[in-house]
UniProtKB/Swiss-Prot annotation:
Modification sites for N-acetylalanine: A2
Coiled coil (residue ranges): 69-673
Subunit annotation: Interacts with SCN10A and clathrin. Identified in a complex containing SCN10A, clathrin and SCLT1.
Cell location: Cytoplasm, Cytoskeleton, Microtubule organizing center, Centrosome, Centriole
PANTHER family, per database record: SODIUM CHANNEL AND CLATHRIN LINKER 1
Stated name of the protein: Sodium channel and clathrin linker 1
GO cellular component: centriole; centrosome; ciliary basal body; ciliary transition fiber; clathrin complex; cytosol; microtubule cytoskeleton
Residues with PTM Phosphoserine: S681
């Protein structure tokens, strides 16, 4: 019995120590949670504390049930021990009373019994009965000593049990007081756990919403990356098209330079033909002067013919020769006049053709320059517009992303503040529950804490509303971005149509160029016939050509500088676009790293929770094994109690048998005393 009670006490002490240790661990975790929250690291420990408290509630209920059962068993055993103690006291009192009565009766009988020889055989019979009675008394005394020894052992055990009971009662009272405190604390913890469960559910909902928003933002970012890739491809295509257009413009400029060179050569040839015509005109004028001189000489000769008829005959031959020469000169003059007229006609035709060609060339130059300028202006404007729009969109998206990040950071800060305030409220509530509930200031503090809690819940609701607004805003941004992307696609299609139209115009220009080349070939054929005449004028024209080449080289340098500036501007724009793309890629990589960090932290939390679940399962298994051991020990204690009850019943039976024997012995003693009294009375009568 004592060993069982010691075992129960040790088991109870172990359970109390485990419970206190677990409670201290929970409080230490709670304090570490508060410190971590103050330092900004209180998410995992807070969830672990909530999980521990949620897991602690059924253990505490089972522990309370087990304590109630043990208290009931202790009360039952105490009742049985009290009853047994009363029965033993009654038995001891009756034994002492019977022993004293027997002792008194025997002493009285022995004193009253005379030692004479007159009795004879009766005395011998009485001696035999006395011997029997003495043997019975010895046996009764032995049983009495055994019963006294048992009574002493039982009394010692009862004293020890009484002491243990008192100690256990003190410990039980302390434990009851502690259990009441623990129940109050558990009730408070249960309320706090309920509140924390609600807050955790809300936090889980918010975390799920945040994860949804993060996934949606990641999807949006991937879509934007795809769109950026498409935009890069389109920009590359546009750059390739611009390069093609620049190549086409360079080809057109080269063709224009060739045409200008052809025009310059045609001008030189025309100038040479003009000079040749001037020379022919000067020769014709000289011939005319000669004709005038010859006419004057003829007049003089005619005047002299009258005077020199004699000499006419002599000079007829000379006159005939002169007439022949005159005829030849007239023929030559006529031929020269015809040549002059043909040259004038050719000159006029050439001038007309040159004017037409110059007009056509000027028109072509104007059209080509307009076309090139329009194309360059359009491409520049479209590239600038697309660049500006892309920059505006990128800046707007970056600003919106930064604003959303700031809002998320602010919301996270507000959530952390709410958690800190809630934990401060919980600390104050714990302090208030520890200090008691008697003062009005505590009630005021409770009301203030309740108001703070309501304010925190309102702020939480406001944060949820802001999150919904942010999600709606993100959806609006997605719709706006999709609309802008569709608009940019339409603009790109328009640009492609414009490029196709410009290609068609370039085809028309190439056809016109072919026509002009054919006309230039014809002009070359015509100028080849005039080259023979213009060989003399080429020497003079070389100087002018060199000057014109110098001028054209200067113009070419200017055009090259302009082209370089255009290329530099295009390169700068490409560098800027690459820089923007690099920044976007960096931002995307940063988002990827952040999402990876979040996923890793979530996985770490999940692993921690799994490890804690496994640890708690092991702890529950250990507690269940301990409970099974305790139940087994309780069953063993019940068996021992039953054995002790059987032993007590045996002792009661022995006591009842001893009482019966004492009663029979007292009856026999009373019979013997009666017989002795009768014998004494008879002896007295005989003496009388």
């Amino acid at each position: 019995m004592a060993a069982e009670i010691d075992f129960l006490r040790e088991q109870n002490r172990r359970l109390n120590e485990d419970f206190r240790r677990y409670q201290m661990e929970s409080f230490s975790k709670y304090s570490s949670v508060q410190k971590a929250v103050c330092q900004g690291e209180g998410d995992d420990t807070f969830e672990n504390l909530v999980f521990d408290q949620s897991f602690l509630a059924p253990l505490v209920t089972e522990y309370d049930k087990h304590l109630g059962e043990l208290n009931g068993q202790l009360k039952y055993y105490q009742k049985q021990v009290g009853e047994m103690k009363l029965q033993l006291e009654n038995v001891i009192k009756e034994n002492e009373r019977l022993h004293s009565e027997l002792k008194d009766a025997v002493e009285k009988k022995l004193e009253a019994f005379p030692l004479g020889t007159e009795v004879g055989t009766d005395i011998y019979a009485d001696d035999e009965t006395v011997r029997n009675l003495q043997e019975q008394l010895q046996l009764a005394n032995q049983e009495k000593t055994q019963a006294v020894e048992l009574w002493q052992t039982v009394s010692q055990e009862l004293d020890r049990l009484h002491k243990l009971y008192q100690e256990h009662m003190t410990e039980a009272q302390i434990h009851v007081f502690e259990s009441q405190k623990q129940k109050d604390q558990l009730f408070d913890f249960q309320q706090l756990t309920k509140q924390l469960h609600v807050t955790n559910e809300n936090m889980e909902v918010t975390n799920q919403q945040f994860l949804k928003t993060v996934t949606e933002q990641s999807v949006i970012i991937e879509q934007l990356r795809k769109k950026l890739r498409q935009a890069k491809l389109e920009l590359r295509v546009a750059v390739a098209k611009v390069e093609e257009l620049t190549n086409v413009t360079e080809d057109l400029q080269g063709q224009m330079k060739k045409k200008e060179k052809d025009v310059v050569s045609a001008h030189g040839r025309e100038e040479a033909s003009d000079r040749r015509l001037q020379q022919l005109q000067s020769s014709i004028k000289q011939l005319e002067i000669r004709l005038c001189v010859t006419i004057q000489e003829a007049n003089q000769l005619r005047t002299e013919n009258t005077h020199l008829e004699k000499q006419t005959r002599e000079l007829q031959a000379k006159c005939n020769e002169l007439e022949n020469e005159r005829y030849e000169a007239i023929v030559r003059a006529r031929n020269s006049m015809q040549l002059l007229e043909e040259a004038n006609l050719q000159k006029s035709q050439a001038l007309l053709e040159e004017k037409q060609k110059e007009e056509d060339i000027e028109k072509m130059k104007e059209t080509v320059s307009r076309f090139v300028q329009d194309a360059t202006i359009r491409t520049k404007k479209e590239v600038a517009n697309t660049k500006k729009q892309c920059n505006i969109q990128i800046s707007r998206l970056t600003e919106e992303l930064s604003a959303l990040q700031m809002e998320c950071a602010e919301k996270q800060g507000q959530i952390e503040r709410v958690i800190k305030e809630k934990k401060a409220v919980e600390e104050e509530l714990e302090k208030i529950y520890r200090e008691g509930r008697g003062n009005e200031s505590d009630y005021r503090k409770l009301e203030e804490m309740h108001q703070r809690f309501l304010v925190s819940e309102r702020s939480k609701d406001d944060l949820q509303l802001r999150l919904t607004r942010a999600e709606n805003r993100i959806k609006q941004l997605e719709t706006d971005s999709s609309e802008e992307i569709s608009r940019y696609q339409e603009m790109i299609q328009k640009l492609q149509n414009v490029l196709e139209s410009e290609r068609e115009n370039c085809g028309l220009v190439s056809e016109q160029r072919l026509k002009l080349q054919q006309e230039n070939k014809q002009l070359r054929k015509e100028t080849e016939s005039l080259r023979k005449i213009a060989l003399e004028a080429q020497k003079k024209a070389k100087v002018k050509i060199s000057t014109m080449e110098h001028e054209f080289s200067i113009k070419e340098r200017g055009f090259e500088v302009q082209l370089r500036e255009m290329e530099d501007s295009n390169r700068n724009s490409i560098v800027e676009l690459r820089h923007l793309l690099a920044t976007q890629q960096k931002a995307a990589n940063r988002w990827k790293e952040e999402t990876k960090k979040l996923t890793e932290s979530a996985e770490i939390r999940i692993n921690n929770l799994k490890s804690e679940l496994s640890r708690q399962k092991l702890h529950t298994q250990e507690l269940l094994s301990q409970l099974e051991m305790a139940n087994e020990k309780v069953a063993e204690n019940e068996k021992l109690i039953l054995e002790h009850q059987e032993k007590a019943n045996r002792l009661q039976r022995r006591l009842s048998q001893a009482e019966e024997r004492a009663a029979s012995a007292s009856q026999q003693l009373s019979v013997i005393t009666v017989q002795r009294r009768k014998a004494a009375s008879l002896m007295n009568l005989e003496n009388i």
